[in-house]
UniProtKB/Swiss-Prot annotation:
Record's keyword terms, sorted: Cytoplasm, Stress response
Short name of one Pfam family: GyrI-like
Protein name: DNA gyrase inhibitor
Entry's localization field: Cytoplasm
Annotated Gene Ontology cellular component terms: cytoplasm
InterPro entries per record: AraC_E-bd, DNA_gyrase_inhibitor, DNA_gyrase_inhibitor_GyrI, GyrI-like, Reg_factor_effector_dom_sf
């Protein structure tokens, strides 16, 4: 899998923080997020899922993720936005790869990306969350085009 190393700016994000198996919580989170975006006429700059844990080290019921939209830096939450978080997604150096996801199988491209990145001795993972940006409406199109972001730092830092 090909990837690039990019410096990414901090993003302001709004949405829902979830805990539990990602294959259940992330789709449910996006249903909640879509309702909130539609009800409050939010104009998202991007749709993202943010992942905080390693599923090979953390039990499924404890996995943390956010389903969010990127919003302008001066965005404030509308009244009655119950359960919605507003926070910053840290910027920095990230490895970035594009993938096409079919049959709701988000795990396969992520695993391929991690495997490829671990082979690159120049970089190691940094202590920031991974995230994906959705480039199309997968529910409408039947597949998802995503950009995957893994935080990295130069080896030895």
């Amino acid at each position: 899998m090909d990837y690039t190393i990019e410096h990414v700016l901090t993003r302001k994000i709004a949405g829902f923080h979830l805990v539990g198996p990602w294959e259940k919580t992330v789709p449910q989170g996006f249903e909640q997020l879509t309702l909130w975006v539609d009800n409050f006429h939010i104009q998202p700059q991007a749709w993202l899922a943010v992942y905080y844990d390693n599923p090979q080290q953390v039990a499924p019921e404890k996995l943390r993720a956010d389903t969010v939209v990127e919003v302008p830096a001066d965005f404030t939450l509308p009244e009655n936005s119950v359960g919605v978080i507003l926070t910053d997604l840290p910027g920095g150096q990230y490895a970035v790869a594009r993938a096409r996801v079919e049959n709701h199988d988000f795990g396969t491209p992520w695993l391929a990306f991690f495997t490829r990145l671990h082979q690159d001795v120049r970089y190691q993972m940094a202590a920031r969350p991974c995230f994906e940006i959705y480039l199309n409406d997968g529910k409408r199109d039947g597949y998802w085009e995503i950009d995957m972001y893994i935080p990295v730092q130069t080896s030895g830092e």
